[in-house]
């Protein structure tokens, strides 16, 4: 052992030579990741890059801590000065930051930047998956993994399916030892120890959010790690690899880490909520639901007051970050109470859950800042563009408002029937009025929320989202509500709304393509290998899911589950054709997430379709069904 450590010995020289030959042989067997000329050509100019970096720092960096901002700015400035050659990892990190910022950029060529952002994300993902992965199992590699997951959701690049790569991110972090507190490793500098705590907190938050979003277990518990929360310090207090003691601020002082610390305080509770509501046996008592929900609401209120005071004092925090921090925690309250939401109509004990679900949904919908008509802030831009869990809480909130408004209309009809005269003096030739003579007390407010959600859904398509279903179904929901109020046939109203919405979406999507590419979209069969009904779920889908498990957003050619908007030219039964790719899915589990999200019993019932995302919302038969929406066996 002594001879091996002595660099002057023959053994040391021989071992070094053997290792060097091994590295050369491995390197010769695979190409090294590099920056392609195509990627270099779409790097934005410095003026635009500066604006994009500022957009990122005022939005997501304050919520999901990934970078040490002073260090990042030094490397960023050195890149533009050209003093040192930029490594691929540095360029990918810089471009991912720019990609996340694109939706918040208001300068010229925003539409073309959307196209570039997709290329930046794809290039970073390819670099991350390239051979010789061991060289990327480090802090920079983990930072890039995190940025890719955020960018995919912000830019709508497969952002609705991040639970799987989020699991890879979690395991990468644990492989690097981030689940153990840096105090266990004396050789780690103070700077790197603090960065490890920050990254671990971000990894846990993304894991929790994506697990809640997909209805899946988080695969981590508080017993699996002992890493402490980040210290309450600003980035400038950390140094850069310098082993100096940290000047930790009191908890009452706002710092760059305050939002992340607030997340970690409620994380154990939120992980338990995910475990319980995704448990196949749902073993939480209603008293525990009330206790946990009240605790989370209290924390949300307390932290929002603290962050607002920091904003008023001119600290480094923005309205976007306050709103995002509140919503990402508050959405857990909504999911916790949803199983009891619809039960409140039959059991007064659960009326509090009905109130909490509505209040939470309205809080999520509340704007971050007061805006003039047509004006946008960062929060509005986020709602108009982002997907993943940044979109899901709006779907959950909007569906809650719809269910509540539907319940209020039904209750108002029942109340009016109680006071109706037993005998009417109206001539027999006069048809009875089927509409409501007086509206529910919150009708205007709740309908305004649904109208706002419709405008948001349209804006999302105008800003690059390619899923037109959201607009169609929100229009159907509004049409059904209006028909119930007016006393007209809701099925006819839903069908008319579906027809007009699909035509509107066709025009908007054509306009979006023209804006991004400067030419009209080519719908000929040969224009793209991914166009048309033949795309379905992709090659080999039947080998994985089975022919009778159309679990995605499309189906194979010739299947009865194929999606075709021409179904709106038929009768009301034709609406099944549009939604059939979302229904009729039974994966053999004992629980139905759709039942949970609709507030139905958590046992398995024949006829339910199983889904792990807000796709349960896209059920046109449900919108037309009224009081039957969500009942077993209806529309499936």
For the regions a language model picked out, list residue spans one by one.
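Acidic/serine-rich, low-complexity amphipathic helices located in mid- to C-terminal regulatory regions
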Residues: 55-58, 150-234, 261, 268, ...
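Intrinsically disordered, low-complexity transcriptional activation domains
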Residues: 284, 382, 453, 459-467, ...
């Amino acid at each position: 052992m002594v001879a091996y450590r002595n660099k002057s010995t023959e053994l040391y020289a021989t071992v070094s030579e053997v290792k060097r030959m091994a590295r050369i042989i491995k390197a010769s067997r695979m190409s090294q990741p590099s920056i392609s000329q195509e990627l270099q050509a779409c790097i934005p100019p410095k003026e635009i890059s500066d604006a994009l970096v500022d957009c990122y720092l005022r939005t997501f960096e304050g919520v999901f801590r990934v970078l040490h901002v002073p260090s990042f700015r030094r490397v960023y400035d050195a890149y533009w000065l050209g003093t040192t050659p930029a490594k691929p990892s540095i360029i990918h990190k810089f471009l991912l930051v720019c990609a996340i910022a694109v939706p918040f950029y208001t300068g010229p060529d925003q539409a073309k930047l959307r196209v570039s952002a997709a290329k930046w994300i794809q290039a970073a993902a390819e670099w991350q998956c390239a051979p010789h992965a061991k060289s990327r199992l480090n802090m920079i590699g983990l930072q890039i993994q995190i940025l890719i997951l955020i960018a995919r959701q912000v830019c709508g690049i497969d952002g609705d399916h991040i639970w799987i790569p989020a699991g890879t991110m979690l395991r990468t972090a644990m492989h690097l030892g981030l689940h153990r507190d840096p105090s266990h490793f004396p050789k780690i500098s103070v700077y790197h120890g603090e960065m490890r705590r920050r990254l671990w907190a971000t990894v846990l938050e993304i894991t929790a959010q994506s697990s809640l979003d997909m209805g899946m277990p988080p695969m981590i518990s508080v017993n699996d790690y002992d890493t402490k929360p980040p210290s309450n310090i600003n980035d400038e207090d950390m140094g850069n690899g310098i082993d100096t003691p940290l000047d930790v601020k009191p908890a009452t002082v706002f710092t760059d880490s305050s939002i992340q610390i607030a997340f970690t305080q409620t994380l154990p509770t939120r992980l338990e909520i995910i475990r319980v509501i995704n448990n196949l046996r749902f073993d939480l008592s209603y008293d525990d639901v009330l206790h946990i929900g009240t605790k989370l609401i209290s924390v949300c209120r307390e932290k929002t007051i603290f962050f607002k005071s920091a904003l008023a004092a001119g600290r480094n925090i923005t309205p976007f970050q306050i709103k995002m921090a509140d919503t990402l925690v508050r959405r857990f309250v909504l999911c916790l109470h949803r199983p009891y939401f619809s039960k409140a109509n039959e059991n007064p004990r659960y009326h509090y859950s009905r109130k909490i679900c509505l209040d939470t949904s309205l809080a999520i919908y509340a704007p971050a800042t007061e805006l003039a008509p047509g004006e946008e802030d960062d929060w509005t831009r986020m709602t108009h563009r982002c997907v993943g869990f940044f979109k899901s809480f709006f779907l959950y909130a909007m569906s809650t408002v719809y269910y509540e408004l539907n319940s209020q209309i039904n209750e108002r009809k029942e109340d009016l029937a109680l006071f109706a005269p037993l005998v009417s003096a109206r001539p027999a030739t006069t048809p009875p009025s089927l509409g409501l003579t007086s509206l529910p007390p919150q009708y205007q407010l709740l309908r305004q929320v649904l109208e706002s959600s419709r405008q948001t859904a349209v804006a999302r398509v105008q800003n690059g989202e390619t899923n037109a279903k959201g607009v169609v179904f929100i229009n159907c929901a509004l049409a059904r509500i209006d028909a119930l109020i007016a006393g007209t046939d809701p099925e006819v109203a839903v069908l008319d709304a579906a027809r007009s919405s699909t035509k509107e979406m066709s025009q908007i999507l054509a306009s979006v393509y023209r804006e991004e590419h400067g030419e009209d979209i080519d719908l000929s069969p040969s224009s793209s290998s991914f166009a048309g009904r033949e795309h379905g779920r992709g090659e080999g889908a039947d080998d994985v899911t089975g022919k009778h498990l159309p679990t995605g957003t499309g189906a194979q050619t010739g299947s009865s589950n194929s999606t075709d908007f021409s179904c709106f030219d038929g009768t009301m039964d034709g609406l099944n054709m549009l939604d059939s790719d979302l229904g009729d899915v039974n994966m053999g589990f004992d629980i139905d997430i759709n039942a949970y999200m609709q507030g139905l019993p958590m046992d398995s019932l024949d006829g339910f379709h199983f889904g792990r995302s807000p796709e349960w919302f896209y059920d046109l038969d449900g919108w037309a069904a009224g009081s039957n929406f969500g009942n077993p066996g209806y529309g499936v």
